[in-house]
């Protein structure tokens, strides 16, 4: 199955975008696809071989899961690569456009349960939440 690629341009310096993308105190504020969900906890050991765990839960308590991965590559303010527990790979690229503009690109292996379009929409919704959070904080 082909990798899925999404991107968004954020009006903020790359250093801020990197920090807000990786710091657990920020991750819990933006890491959900819909307002009926939230991210109550986040742990992030941002180094090669380090692990992250973002807890995702429906606000009504009906469902929840841990989004877990292990870092394969970390280049400060430029790139992150990780793999999830099921072996799928994700790459996140932070591209400095200018002093106050950053393009974030996510490239990921889709899972087989849901349609590629549904996955693209879900991942993009989270990336868009991130975009709004960074520009408003």
Residues of each region from the PLM?
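Hydrophobic ligand-binding cavity/cleft-lining segments
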Residues: 1-38
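Short, surface-exposed coil-to-beta transition loops
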Residues: 5, 64-68, 87-91
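Generic structural detector for well-ordered beta-strands
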Residues: 5-11, 45, 55, 70, ...
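A short, structured loop/turn motif at beta-sheet edges
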Residues: 14-15, 46-48, 72-77, 93-103
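Short amphipathic alpha-helical signal-transduction/dimerization elements
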Residues: 22, 127-135
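Glycine-rich portal/gate segments that line the openings of hydrophobic small-molecule binding cavities
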Residues: 38-82
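Beta-strand/loop substructures that line and gate deep hydrophobic ligand-binding cavities in soluble
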Residues: 79-125, 130
């Amino acid at each position: 199955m082909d990798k899925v690629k999404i991107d968004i341009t954020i009006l903020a310096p790359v250093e801020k975008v990197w920090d807000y993308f990786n710091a657990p105190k920020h991750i819990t504020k933006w890491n959900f696809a819909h307002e009926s969900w939230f991210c109550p906890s986040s742990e992030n050991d941002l180094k090669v071989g380090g692990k992250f765990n973002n807890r995702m839960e429906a606000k009504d308590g009906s469902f929840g899961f841990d989004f877990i991965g292990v870092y394969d590559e970390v280049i400060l303010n430029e790139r992150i690569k990780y793999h999830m527990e099921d072996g799928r790979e994700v790459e996140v690229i932070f591209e400095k456009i200018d002093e106050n503009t950053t393009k974030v690109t996510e490239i990921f292996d889709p899972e087989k349960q849901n349609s590629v379009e549904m996955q693209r929409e879900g991942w993009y919704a989270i990336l868009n939440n991130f975009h709004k959070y960074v520009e408003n904080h």
